[in-house]
Structure formats: structure tokens, C-alpha cells
């Protein structure tokens, strides 16, 4: 079975915003590379990733919390309903063989932080964790400065192509993709 990439992102984005288009491109490229995609299942970038993956022929899992809404976006093909937001977050982390964090708000930051800390504390096996774009660079830099042991666990990728190449190299046996070097955090 194809590896699952859990994608973290905001519900507060709409077409034609740049972050929505970025998320759509990410979903499509993940599907084309052979990944299944999991998202929080709702609107915004979660919808855009789901839409991109579905339109590219991929499989999409949406994890929704009944405390928020049990209705996933129309592009989700498999819906997992859990009781609470925190259950949803932990299920997305458990489902993922790798992760991508899109630009987002406090909820997206919480998702990125939980995956990062669970890898750091070895509560889950090491998995590729990609932060997409410059948006996350200052936050990751500050955390890595404060805690050197967390350094290198999150890769900042400057493009969808770079992010998918890194995930493919790590997770797809026989992949011809080579990780594309990223810019160092300053």
C-alpha cells in the first residue's frame, strides 16, 4: 500500500489565494508521485490538497472531529470521524508516513509541533517532516536555537517540487527522486 502523507494547513484559505493554489499543487504532486494523502478533512488548504490529489487520481483520507463537524469536504474519499480536535490531530500524526506543513495559523503550528515533538521524543519512528516555504523558517529557527536536539528534524522546502522530492527519496523504494538541497536556516 502506498505511503500516506499527512498535510497540515489552515481552514482559512480560499481559491484563488496563493496558499490555496500551493496546497492544490501539493496534493496533485503527492498523488502523481504515488502517495496517499491525509488532511484534517475540512475547507481551506485541507480542501485544496484533497482536491489536487483527487483530480490527479490519488486517494484522500479526511480526519474530522465530530465536536467540530462530521462533514468532510467533497474531495475526501475516505472519512475518519473522531470525537475531538485533539483526537483528530493525533490520528493525522499516526496515519502519516511523512508530513508536510503548509503556511497556516495556530492550529497548523500545533500540528507541526506535535509531529515534530513526537519524532524528537521517539514516541513515533523517525519520519520525514517538511515545512513548505519561508513562512515557517523563523519559527523553526527559534525552536532549533532553543533546543539543539530538535535541529534537523524538520526540512524547510522552498517549493512543492522540493518537498515531494524529499518525501519520495525517503519513502518510495526505488524512487529516482533525489532530495533537493534546501537553504540553511539563518
PLM region spans:
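Short, conserved catalytic or adaptor-binding loops enriched in Gly and charged residues
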Residues: 71-74, 145-149
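Short, acidic/small-residue loops that bind anionic groups at enzyme active sites
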Residues: 63-66, 102, 118-142, 149-152
